[in-house]
């Protein structure tokens, strides 16, 4: 994708957060709660899944008090956390858009029913549950706004030296791509080398290999549809190949 498209996607996500901050934090709290209640325990230093969830929350500017509350809630509540199940659905929309929806739900029937209704409303088709379309690759993503670093060349060198797969530099930010298996290791090394604290994005994502473009009117309709689906309490993440 072009740099503008990547940055537009970041701004789109941040705008959605500003408009419904409490819902975003609720989803992040649920993710932290489930990770902390698992076999890895409530210590991010010894629980990779929890550490990833906390890094993601911090990148979304979730207050420290909210994170600590979710961690505290997890203590002794593993039974409640076990009721949450991950559900992955992929589907296609008219015009060639591919959508990947990841849910974390304590009610599978409700989640499935809502996802099916959303795709039906826009004329889309759902694929098999649990399948990841071939156009998506699972990658670690670190987005760093330009004001957070002084020299893009130094950032690139430090990131590649830390084990990053790729570094993409754009007008307003840089994107560091990693293998999911060494995401936290790369992030820790970059943090130490450049004294970085703030990220626009710090999480594992499904990135599309190709994108599709739409005319403005259709694009606005798709954006509204995605935002409505994001508001669903069971939906944690939505990935797509639309060039916004």
UniProtKB/Swiss-Prot annotation:
The keyword Transcription regulation applies. One of its GO terms (molecular function) is DNA binding. Keywords: Cytoplasm, DNA-binding, Transcription, Transcription regulation. InterPro entries: Integrase-like_N, TACO1_YebC-like_2nd/3rd_dom, TACO1_YebC_N, Transcrip_reg_TACO1-like, Transcrip_reg_TACO1-like_dom3, YebC-like. Disulfide bonds: none annotated. Coiled coil: none annotated. It is found in: Cytoplasm. It holds the Pfam family TACO1_YebC_N. Its main location: cytoplasm. The keyword Signal does not apply. GO terms for biological process: regulation of DNA-templated transcription. One of its GO terms (cellular component) is cytosol. Belongs to the TACO1 family. This is Probable transcriptional regulatory protein MMOB1910. It comes from Mycoplasma mobile (strain ATCC 43663 / 163K / NCTC 11711).
């Amino acid at each position: 994708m072009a740099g503008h498209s990547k940055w537009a996607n970041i701004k789109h996500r941040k705008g959605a957060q500003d408009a419904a901050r409490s819902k975003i934090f609720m989803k992040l709290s649920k993710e932290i709660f489930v990770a902390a209640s698992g076999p890895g325990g409530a210590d991010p230093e010894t629980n990779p899944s929890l550490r990833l969830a906390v890094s993601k929350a911090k990148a979304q500017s979730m207050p420290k008090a909210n994170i600590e509350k979710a961690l505290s809630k997890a203590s002794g509540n593993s039974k409640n956390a076990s009721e949450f199940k991950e559900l992955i659905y992929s589907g296609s929309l008219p015009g060639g858009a591919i959508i990947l929806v990841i849910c974390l739900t304590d009610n599978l029937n409700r989640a499935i029913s809502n996802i099916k209704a959303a795709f039906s409303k826009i004329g889309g088709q759902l694929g098999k549950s649990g399948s990841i379309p071939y156009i998506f690759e699972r990658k670690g993503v670190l987005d760093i706004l330009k004001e957070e670093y002084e020299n893009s060349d130094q950032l690139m060198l430090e990131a590649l030296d830390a084990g990053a797969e790729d570094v993409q530099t754009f007008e307003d930010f840089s994107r560091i791509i990693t293998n999911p298996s060494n995401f936290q290791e790369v992030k820790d090394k970059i943090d130490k080398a450049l004294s970085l604290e703030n990220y626009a994005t710090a999480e594992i994502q499904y990135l599309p290999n190709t994108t599709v473009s739409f005319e403005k009117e259709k694009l606005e309709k798709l954006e509204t549809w995605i935002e409505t689906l994001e508001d669903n309490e069971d939906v944690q993440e939505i990935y797509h190949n639309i060039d916004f």
